[in-house]
Amino acid sequence: MTTRTILLTLLGLGLLAFLYVTFFSESTGADASIDPVRYRQELLDKRAKKDEDFRSGSDSPVPDKATFNGLSYFAPDPAYRVTARLEPFADKTQKLVVRMSDGSEEVYEKFAHAVFRLNGETCRLLIVKVDDTYSILFRDLTSGQETYGGGRYLELDPKQMADTQAVLDFNTAYNPYCAYNPGYACPLPPAENKLPVAVKAGERYTHRTETSLLLDARP
């Protein structure tokens, strides 16, 4: 084998490695490490517990617990549990001013961007950190239609986060309290966190109040 052939071979291997990192490290799609049957049951159990908390809990946002019949959800779908590539902020002092549903503002720490593939699209979402909680405030093509117009929230499990990757489980996406009670002030997703796909996973939204209708109409 000539020197030229060896160099061409090495260049070819390098190109393949680059393409792999570029196109496949963004997301592996559905998390193949889970047992679909067990995962579905665990998710249904958590939803049942949340319904009970909303129905009888002292901190429930539901004004009329007597008529509460449970939250509305999309069916569990492992395809909406994805692995994302993390792009952390080198400067940990970067902050995000978040507008609240009542017009006030709060300041959160910018933690990282999550880059992943979902429904055939490359998506990018900002992760914020508040104390020890990592959250994503997002909207998607279902917002204002099948889900709350003011957006939904997704919390990340630190146990499923590494330096370069994190699991995003949109089956656990939930509505803020202000979706059910206008007495609560809730953070609204930043403009950059509007997904170009319909996330048919997590909590749906069928209740409409004057406040929620205004948020549903937001672009």
Model feature map: region roles:
Residues D140-Y174:
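Acidic, glycine-rich flexible loop segments
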Residues F24-Q41:
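Ser/Thr/Pro/Gly-rich low-complexity linker/stalk segments immediately outside membranes or between
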Residues T5-T22:
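Hydrophobic membrane-insertion alpha-helices, especially the h-region
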Residues K46, F54-L96:
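Extracytoplasmic/periplasmic/luminal assembly and interaction segments
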Residues Y184-P219:
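C-terminal partner/receptor-binding element of secreted or periplasmic proteins
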Residues P88-Y153:
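Mid-length scaffold segments of soluble, non-membrane domains
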Residues T67-L71, K95-R99, G103-K110, L126, ...:
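Extracellular/lumen-exposed scaffold segments
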